[in-house]
Regions:
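A short acidic, amphipathic alpha-helical/loop segment
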Residues: 121-125, 148
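Short, Lys/Arg-enriched N-terminal segments with co-localized hydrophobic residues
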Residues: 16-30
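Glycine-rich, aromatic-bearing surface loops/beta-hairpins
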Residues: 180-214
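Acidic-basic catalytic patches of nuclease active cores, encompassing PD-(D/E)XK
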Residues: 46-91
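Conserved catalytic cores of phosphodiester-cleaving nucleases, focusing on short active-site segments
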Residues: 99-101, 106-122
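Long amphipathic N-terminal alpha/beta scaffold segment
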Residues: 85-104
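Short, hydrophobic/π-rich interface segment
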Residues: 147-184
Length: 214
């Protein structure tokens, strides 16, 4: 074999090795970022909406997601529960919301965001879904966030924005366990969420923006 052929074969093997290393590193990365699975049996008695049902929930919690955020997602499910509402991939897929409800054709009816999304993400969701609900939390930081996005978000007619009360997310986070049995009662625009061993958390919110009639 001449020197030119030796060089070509060497480069070929280097590419193979690099490809193998890339595949191995990708698998290790996927393993490192693997979500933790939580299970929750949720009993809902919503007297405001006349909705009464039990739900068996499976929640994938991304390594970067806090207990507080995960439990706010569960609270959001309880507040807007329906037969078709479901958790998305969450932080594992930035193109999906925290929760959503689709019709039988796959069209998005309800898009629920938890946290403090920027105005571009909210606008994009507004164009994809019939209604968008943002549930912010964090007390004072939510107020600052809202002032930053308000001027643009208020133009979006199908968007609702709520802000949970100070300390609510932290109190919900304290309920987090890998396997949970939760009860949620909703009456007069207040929800109480608890388990069998602790006092229920009063979940109250301020309406930053209500949807307009379309």
């Amino acid at each position: 074999m001449n020197p030119a052929q030796d060089l070509l074969e060497t480069r070929y093997h280097v590419r193979l090795l690099r490809g193998a290393e890339f595949t191995r590193d990708s698998r290790l990365s996927d393993m490192a970022l693997k979500s933790t699975i939580y299970k929750a049996e949720l009993q809902i008695a919503d007297m405001d909406r006349h909705y009464y049902a039990d739900h068996a929930l499976t929640i994938a919690c991304h390594p970067s997601e806090t207990d507080e955020r995960m439990m706010v997602r569960i609270a959001a499910f309880a507040l807007f529960a329906s037969d078709r509402l479901e958790f998305s991939k969450g932080l594992s897929d930035t193109d999906e919301p925290s929760l959503w409800c689709k019709d039988y054709t796959g069209a998005v009816q309800t898009w629920i965001e938890v946290g403090q999304p920027d105005e571009r993400r909210i606008a994009k969701a507004s164009g994809r879904a019939e209604e968008v609900i943002v549930i912010a939390y964090g007390g004072r930081t939510s107020d600052i966030w809202w002032q930053g996005v308000r001027s643009k978000v208020e133009r979006l007619r199908n968007v609702t924005v709520w802000s949970l009360g100070e300390g609510v997310a932290a109190s919900l986070g304290a309920l987090a366990e890998r396997t949970m049995r939760l009860q949620c009662t909703v009456q007069d625009r207040t929800a109480w969420i608890g388990n069998t061993t602790s006092e229920p958390v009063a979940v109250e919110w301020t309406v930053f923006k209500a949807p307009e009639n379309v």
